[in-house]
């Protein structure tokens, strides 16, 4: 049994590195019925960047008809603000 077909999106972001980023992003997606298809992330060492940047790419799907992209973006803006993300 596979996941329901739906719309697929890719979220890319960067922010100062600190604990809780992966948890916050994945929790947001779960709360919005998203299925994470792939996720990559890495932290840039502080010697390369003064604030130690964190980078993440998440490929996810939401069940059809799913939530409109604008609604997901509005909701995610709260997560982005909390971590000072560029996305």
Predicted ranges, named:
Residues 1-87:
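A conserved regulatory-domain signal marking ACT and ACT-like small-molecule sensing domains
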């Amino acid at each position: 049994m596979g996941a329901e077909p739906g719309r697929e999106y890719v979220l890319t972001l960067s922010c100062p590195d600190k604990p809780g980023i992966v948890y916050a992003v994945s929790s947001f997606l779960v709360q919005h019925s998203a299925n994470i298809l792939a996720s990559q992330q890495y932290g840039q060492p502080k010697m390369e960047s003064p604030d130690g940047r964190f980078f993440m790419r998440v490929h996810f799907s939401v069940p059809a008809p799913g939530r409109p992209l604008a609604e997901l973006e509005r909701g995610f803006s709260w997560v982005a603000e909390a971590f000072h993300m560029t996305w």
